[in-house]
């Protein structure tokens, strides 16, 4: 039985991943959790729960074993760059020492930083601007360089992941519910067809599972997963998809001259890395391997809208 060890199992992506993995009968899951895990899976013959701290080398050593597959979803957002790099160095060392077969590391597509390219691929030169982007890129490089020739490392770079219990799209939905129709139209006129670079969490999970199971050796390869191939993945169409699901009237956007120039200046002033309203992230490299998404963008937005509505009713 294949052993799969997971860090960040109680995270947003981790929760959705466990739902899919729980349906697999030929896997033994080893889950690293904190003291109060929010997991729907209980310890059993096929599920081992390791309680501990990512900064503790003993915890990491107890998580991995020879020949296992590691899925790393963890990032310590409240910790410093140095502490996050310490975790990664310790994880890499643990993988080397026991002989982990493959490590699938979940990074982020925004490591590309403030590139001016309209289409971002895995070959786009990264120009990270924020500390988060720089840390995430350095983590990728540490894993690849530390485990080269020892453990196969595959990096997955999702764009803005949304879905049930996720934070992306919350602001758009909140604005639709709370702002006046005029302010909503004004904001929509400004953002209009600006690409949102969203990706359904279901598709991120499918990509992780695909790369976990692929037979070809992909050591050191990076893969973007995005729903930017979907035309509606922009502000105007997405807010109207949500409006439809909420039973609201369509949001209209009046003409605003030089809207994207104004938006670029606003985003630049707020020190955002991506000020390009037309940026798309390409998943062609992943698709060329035979990967198929599990859900279309419109359906993902519908599911998010349904969860959001239920959340409002419970609050």
Residue ranges of model-derived segments:
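NAD(P)H-binding glycine-rich loop region in Rossmannoid oxidoreductase-like domains
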Residues: 51-90, 94-96, 111-112
């Amino acid at each position: 039985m294949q052993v799969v060890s997971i860090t960040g199992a109680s995270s947003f992506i981790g929760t959705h991943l466990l739902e899919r993995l729980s349906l697999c009968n030929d896997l033994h899951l080893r889950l690293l959790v904190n003291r109060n895990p929010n997991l729907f899976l209980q310890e059993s013959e096929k599920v081992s729960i390791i309680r501990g701290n990512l900064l503790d080398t003993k915890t990491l050593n107890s998580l991995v074993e020879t020949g296992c597959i590691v899925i790393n979803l963890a990032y310590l957002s409240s910790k410093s760059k140095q502490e996050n790099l310490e975790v990664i160095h310790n994880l890499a060392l643990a993988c080397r020492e026991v002989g982990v077969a493959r490590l699938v590391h979940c990074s982020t597509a925004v490591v590309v930083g403030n590139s001016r390219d309209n289409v971002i691929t895995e070959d786009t030169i990264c120009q990270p601007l924020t500390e988060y982007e720089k840390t995430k890129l350095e983590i990728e490089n540490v894993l690849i360089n530390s485990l080269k020739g020892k453990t196969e490392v595959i990096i997955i770079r999702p764009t803005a992941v949304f879905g049930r219990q996720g934070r992306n799209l919350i602001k758009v939905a909140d604005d639709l519910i709370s702002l006046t129709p005029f302010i909503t139209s004004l904001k929509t006129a400004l953002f209009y067809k600006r690409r949102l670079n969203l990706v359904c969490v279901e598709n991120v999970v499918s990509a992780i599972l695909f790369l976990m199971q692929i037979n070809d050796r992909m050591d050191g390869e990076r893969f973007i997963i995005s729903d930017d191939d979907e035309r509606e993945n922009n502000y105007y169409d997405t807010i109207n998809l949500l409006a439809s699901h909420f039973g609201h009237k369509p949001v209209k956007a009046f003409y605003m001259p030089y809207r994207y120039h104004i938006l670029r200046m606003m985003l630049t002033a707020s020190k955002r890395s991506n000020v390009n309203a037309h940026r798309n992230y390409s998943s062609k490299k992943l698709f060329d391997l035979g990967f198929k998404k599990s859900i279309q963008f419109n359906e993902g937005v519908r599911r998010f809208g349904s969860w959001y509505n239920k959340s409002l009713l419970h609050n």
